[in-house]
Amino acid sequence: MRLRKYNKSLGWLSLFAGTVLLSGCNSALLDPKGQIGLEQRSLILTAFGLMLIVVIPAILMAVGFAWKYRASNKDAKYSPNWSHSNKVEAVVWTVPILIIIFLAVLTWKTTHALEPSKPLAHDEKPITIEVVSMDWKWFFIYPEQGIATVNEIAFPANTPVYFKVTSNSVMNSFFIPRLGSQIYAMAGMQTRLHLIANEPGTYDGISASYSGPGFSGMKFKAIATPDRAAFDQWVAKAKQSPNTMSDMAAFEKLAAPSEYNQVEYFSNVKPDLFADVINKFMAHGKSMDMTQPEGEHSAHEGMEGMDMSHAESAH
């Protein structure tokens, strides 16, 4: 008896402690600060609510049936030969089928509406940022501003941001949870992502795909400035850096594997550096093709400069 009371008290204490600990958690996906993130949250909550139409009655019936047909209830109807009911069959099949159809239509429409490579309709001109995933850091190039950074980006709030993403190493995943979709980064290929921040703030960016021992520290900050003037000040600060990225030798030096990297700024960047990073893998592929049959060589060569705009992404 004492053991039962002890276990019961321990159970309530664990439940209370878990509730307190979970109250300190902050789900970025359910607290978005960008238009894409808001629409994705709406989709998640809608799908969750529809599934509860099935889940809640199932839980209630499981508890209700167990209570009604308990051994001590002598008034419960005993029907050992019962095997079929048209009414029950109609409900348990019709409701889930209708929900699945609705979810299918909803998912189809929102998947196409939130296609990552689709430019956002907005009056402001997008800020273009070229993203290169490295071991284990993020390298960002601003081709229009002529600067580059490591593990930090900035852009004005309420202004679309156009990300061009590739990898200098293994496959990775570029993700700013509070702003919206993640997109894969793949060597020798370019993926595209369009996001926007609805309000100023500093948002966490992460690698959403395991990529080696430094994966856990592969994080960056995305700063949505209050206005264009604040963004220009950030660009001016980067231009004051003594660091430059003037050739591929400097790039390869930066790309050497390292963990938990600090923010760095580069005041000057080699023109078309992003394209050079992609092309160096394509050139390697072409040299490998020299030993392959002509038909295979042609097939691989046709993939040069591939734009994987429809690569899988989290919507």
UniProtKB/Swiss-Prot annotation:
Residue ranges, compositional bias (Basic and acidic residues): 294-315
Cytoplasmic compartment residues: 69-92
The keyword Lipoprotein is assigned to this record: yes
Annotated transmembrane regions: 51-68, 93-111
Keywords linked to the UniProt accession: Cell inner membrane, Cell membrane, Electron transport, Lipoprotein, Membrane, Oxidoreductase, Palmitate, Respiratory chain, Signal, Transmembrane, Transmembrane helix, Transport
GO biological process: aerobic electron transport chain; aerobic respiration; ATP synthesis coupled electron transport; electron transport coupled proton transport
Residue intervals annotated with topology Periplasmic: 25-50, 112-315
Family per similarity comment: Belongs to the cytochrome c oxidase subunit 2 family.
Protein name: Cytochrome bo(3) ubiquinol oxidase subunit 2
